[in-house]
Every structure is written in structure tokens, then in C-alpha cells.
Amino acid sequence: MKFLALLVLSAALLTSACGNNAATDGEKVFRYGTPAYGIANENAGMDPHEAYQGWSAIRYGVGETLFKFDDAMQPQPWLAEKYEFINENTVKITLKDNIYFTSGNKMTGAAVKACLEDLISRHNRARVDLKITGITAEGQTVTITSAAKVPVLINYLCDPYGCIIDMSRGTGDDTKISGTGPFMVESLTPKEVVLVKNPAYYGGVPKTDRIIVSSITDGNTLALALQNGEIDAAQGLPYASLPLFKNSAAYKTSSTDTSRTFLAAFNFNTPALQDERVRRAVVMSLDKETFARVQLMGNGIAAAGPFPPNLPFGGAKVHAPEYNPQGARKLLAEAGWTDTDGDGYVDKDGQPLTLRWLTYSFRQELPLLAEAAQSWLKETGICLEINPTDGYADFLRRGEWDIYAKAFVTAPTGDAQYYFTTHVLKESAYNSGNYYNPDTESLIGQHGSEFRPEKRTELAAAISRKLVDGSAFAYIAHLKMTLAMKSTVQGFAAHPCDYYEITKDLSID
């Protein structure tokens, strides 16, 4: 009866999530289920200058950036034809000709200038990344001047916030946002996006007429939707369900290694965590290999630092402490934390070492990590109170947490600077735990102004080592991304940077 109830509940959720968008006769419709779209992801919209909505605009084929990453995570021209650094602070970008927004207006230097100016006026991260002080346009060229050296400016322009849109159409109505992509928004809610093909797309007429993207955050419901044919493809399936689709001729999968990393920030306002020995004890208590093998079911690898080994500044460049609960207990004892009452948990001055582990639930693996961490830390003598909630932002804001675990793409630009500037600097937007180290700040400053690739790699590795050696953060695993789909789906493949999903070549027979 319990199983039947779950099945009925899943079916009800499925109907609610997927709606009843019926295909018109002869119309090719692609239905896509994902937990990666929605308010909790800060991407429920198509305005690239608002939070992470640019990810939706790029992922779902509404817009494009001046440059895009290839499979080796190297930036290549997309809307741009070429670029040239005039000096260390100035780059001149030549745009491709005869590209039009879905509004019918031509993409010109002036249009790109207007878009980028709106971007840096409204998007804090873009403003910090790009450091733009001036933009000029002439014909099909746009020249960008930055206040300081930005060696990876071209990489940053690949970020979805750099999606080029027609500002003359405004950004207040998602259905009117006009990009250059193969699809246009017909309707949009926090739960669903309906797109129709752009018949005037410069790259050729899209092979699919209509795309329906549904936000399905429950993993079992998502898997059931694909099994029942309610959707044609899914991203973010629970790893336990992947064999259902990998081992069936009716389906196929596309996988790739990514820099999406399961990591945890320490709250440096928590007195106990101000002691490096306690932070290191927490890190040594995390059984990363087991998490990658069991909870991720081999769809990830244990992390040494913030970056995976396939990047030149990741992997072997950093050496993290091994899983060692006994060694962790010794560190806690050195810090004055011992089990004085025999209850299995360490205490100090009559107070147990109780830590609050905050995470969110819309990424399937994070609650599993929280439960595993609770068990691992218990073995060390640390009491862990876990809080997997999609209201995590409120807890962060109120400071009601000690360890915050999340999944984050640490190198979406193919470079280490993105992670350092967003998480590690004292003023970083996502430095939730108020980590600060003047030596690290200095190294990041050097890295940010260095143009030579070899030196950038050397500095990035040095910064990573400093973070790991000081137990500033806990790096747990690097994720492999997998898309599952019906065998009749073509032109739908996973990409290392997690930006690109729906293209003109997507089709379903």
C-alpha cells in the first residue's frame, strides 16, 4: 500500500509538473524535465542581467554569448568573429555580420554596447568580474576598456550573464526578451518554460518546433516521468535510477566530467570553527571516496581541492588530508575537545561539539551527503544537526549554520579565477562563512593580473593548496553530469561547462 501511495503521489506531481501541453498535428515537440530550473536556482526567468537567469537563456536556446566554450573548455567565437587585445586593459571585438535578434533588429556594435552597459549596471558579479570602465561601438565592432587587467575577459564573456539581448525590447517581460538563439519564449512560469523555434535563426531552421522545459525537483518523479513517456529527456536524475536508462535499448545517456564540485564552507563566526584543528578534523572525518563510490554510484570522483584533475591547476596539484577518524579525534583532543561523559560525543567546558550542517534538497545528492556526513562525524565524536532546506538562503542570511554544503561549478570559465573571486576573497559575493586570509588575497590579486598561462596555472595551484592546507573549505567530490533521454532523441549532449543543452540540432523522431 505504501508503494502504491508513493506511485499515486508521483503521478500527481508528474501531472502538475509536466502540464498538458499537447502537440499540434505534425509539430515536433521536445519535453525536458530538470531540477535545475526554478526559483530556488535563481534562474526562473530569461533576463541574463538578473541573478542566474542567463543560465536559462543559454541552456534553453534563447540567447547566445559573444564567445562559447568548446569541449576542452577553451573559448571560441560565437556571436563574435574575432578579438584583439589593444593593450592589457582594452579588447576590440569584431562581431559577425547579418545576425538578427528575434525582434527583427540587427545585432550591431551599438546593440551589444547597450546590452553590456545594462549588464554591468545591474549584475554585481559581472561588474566585479569584467571591471568595465568604458564601451565604445562602431559598426560591427565593440571596444571594451577595463579598470584593471582582466586576462580572462574573453572567458568571462562566455558566462551566461554575457548573453546578448536586444535592449530595445526591455527585460521586464520574459516572453518579450529577444536573443539571437534558435528558440523564443512563448510562456514562462517558475515551474515551466515553453519555447517555439526561431524560423529566422541565422544558423539554420531548428529541427524541433516546440520545447517544453518542466521543473521537476523530486528525483523519483523525474525518473517516473521519463519512464512513462511524459518527458523525452531528463537532467539531474538520482544516480540509483540511471541504470534503468543505461541498460535499456529504449533510452540512451550522454555523460561528461565537469567542474561541478560538492563543497562545504565553514562559518568562521562559529567559535569552535575558528580553530583550524577543528576544521581539519571535520575534513578528515568526511569519507569522500565512499561518497563518490556509493552515494554518487561512481558518477563522480573524490575531490582534493576545488578543481577536478582534468584541469591543469587541479587534481594532483593539491594534496588533501585523507579520511582518518582516529586522527581527527586526536586533533579535537589537541584543541581541548574530548568525550568526558562517555556519550560518544566530544565536549569542552561542559558543552558538546554540535555543528549545524545546512544544505538544500533540489540537488538530489546533497541530502544524501548530509546524512552521510552526520554518520561520519558521529564516529569522530561531533554531533551534526542537518538541515536540508530550499529556504537555505534565509538561514545563511541569519547566520544560523556552521557548515554549508552545496554543489558549485568552480571553473565554468575554464579558469580558476571565477571560483576565487566569487568565494574566497573577503568581499566575495559567496564567501558565506567570512573566510579571510591576507596571503590568499595577495595571491589572488597576482593571479588576476597575470596573462601568462603557465604562471596563472602555478598561482591557481598555490591558492588551492593554501585553501586546502588551512582547511578553509571542505572539498568533497567532483560530479559527472549525465543526461538521459529516449533513444529517438538526437542532438542532445552533455557539455563540460553545463551551459549548453538545447540547440538547433535537437530533434526527436
Where are these regions (language model features)?
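A bilobed periplasmic-binding-protein/Venus flytrap-type ligand-binding module shared by bacterial periplasmic
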Residues: 96, 196-201, 258-281, 285, ...
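Ligand-site clamp/hinge motif
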Residues: 171, 199-244, 383
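Append "and occasionally in soluble cytosolic enzymes with long acidic Gly/Pro-rich linkers
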Residues: 274-374
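Detector for C-terminal structural segments
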Residues: 285-315, 365-374, 396-509
